[in-house]
Amino acid sequence: MNFVKVLFFISACILIMLSAVSGAPEPRWKVFKKIERMGQHIRDGIIKAGPAVAVVGQASTIISG
């Protein structure tokens, strides 16, 4: 009997959580959008730094001989 009550309570909680997510997805996904944007900034920074790193590598090989 207690197991049935616990199972019903867990099912009700999951149903409420799913309805809350589908009802208002904007605030919940805002955190993930910020993380995604931060990853894009890091990727863009690496792409922009690529030629500079290549020049430094060439300069060090020229200096080394």
UniProtKB/Swiss-Prot annotation:
Keywords: Antimicrobial, Immunity, Innate immunity, Secreted, Signal. Pfam families: Cecropin. GO terms for cellular component: extracellular region. It is found in: Secreted. InterPro entries: Cecropin. Disulfide bonds: none annotated. One of its GO terms (biological process) is defense response to Gram-positive bacterium. It comes from the Eukaryota. Residues 1-23 form the signal peptide. Induction: Induced by A.niger alpha-1,3-glucan. Has antibacterial activity. Belongs to the cecropin family. This is Cecropin. It comes from Galleria mellonella. The lineage of its organism: Eukaryota, Metazoa, Ecdysozoa, Arthropoda, Hexapoda. The gene is LOC113514368.
